[in-house]
């Protein structure tokens, strides 16, 4: 999955450029030389950071991008794939001056058994809160660390506490999909009420 994601993001650099957006991919790995070589051969920026605590690892990725002079940081996990059309939504909101964009919903696909589902997003007290991946955040909103550095879980909530309310969009048409396994931090089995969908619609997304 890792190499497929690296190729996927390289393709998205071209898709973003077609829409007038400059995209650079920053990879923060903890697997050593093999991952570094994979990332750098494709043309991505790479830094090695311990996998735990995850909060410190995520903060290192954000800091690497900010130190390189980017205007926005896009948070995307290495298990996530999406259609190029998502850039149309991001471009329009960037051009409108929006500083924080989030995605409210998500597709999930367990590669082990082809269980695929569509989740509409948080309800109750968390209604309207964006999911973790796909958050597009302007540099002016990031003061110090974006995440609690000591955390290995609840990272999305720790970032939300530091940020204003997001302008939230849907990925239903853009097929943002998180490829899950039972060993994932948030396995697909935690969403028993999510709508079941046909996994084959995600196949064209995987390089």
Language model features with spans:
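Acidic helix N-cap motif at the loop->helix transition within catalytic regions
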Residues: 33-40
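C-terminal catalytic/acceptor-binding lobe
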Residues: 149-207
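Catalytic phosphate/metal-binding cores of nucleic-acid and nucleotide-processing enzymes, i.e., regions
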Residues: 4, 19-21, 55, 98, ...
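Short, well-formed alpha-helical segments that are part of the catalytic scaffolds
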Residues: 1-18
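Short beta-strand/loop segment that forms part of the nucleotide-sugar
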Residues: 17-33, 47-51
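Short beta-strand-to-loop acidic/aromatic patch adjacent to the donor-nucleotide binding site
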Residues: 70-81
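Conserved catalytic core of nucleotide-sugar-dependent glycosyltransferases
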Residues: 81-154
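Glycine-rich, basic loop-to-helix element that forms the pyrophosphate-binding segment
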Residues: 51-65
């Amino acid at each position: 999955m890792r190499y497929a994601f690296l190729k996927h993001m390289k393709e998205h650099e071209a898709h973003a450029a077609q829409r007038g957006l400059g995209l650079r991919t920053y990879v923060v790995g903890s697997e050593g030389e093999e991952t570094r070589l994979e990332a750098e051969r494709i043309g991505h920026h790479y830094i090695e950071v311990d996998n735990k605590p995850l909060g410190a690892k995520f903060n290192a990725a954000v800091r690497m991008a900010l130190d390189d002079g980017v205007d926005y940081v896009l948070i995307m996990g290495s298990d996530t794939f999406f259609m190029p059309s998502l850039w149309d939504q991001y471009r329009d909101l960037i051009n409108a001056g929006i500083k924080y964009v989030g995605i409210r919903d998500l597709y999930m696909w367990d590669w082990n058994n082809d269980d695929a589902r569509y989740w509409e997003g948080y309800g109750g007290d968390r209604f309207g809160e964006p999911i973790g991946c796909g958050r597009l955040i302007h540099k002016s909103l990031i003061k110090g660390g974006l995440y609690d550095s000591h955390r290995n879980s609840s990272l999305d909530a720790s970032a939300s506490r530091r940020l204003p309310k997001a302008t939230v969009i849907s990925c239903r048409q853009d097929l943002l999909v998180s490829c899950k396994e039972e060993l994932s931090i948030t396995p697909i089995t935690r969403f028993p009420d999510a709508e079941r969908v046909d996994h084959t619609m995600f196949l064209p997304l995987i390089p």
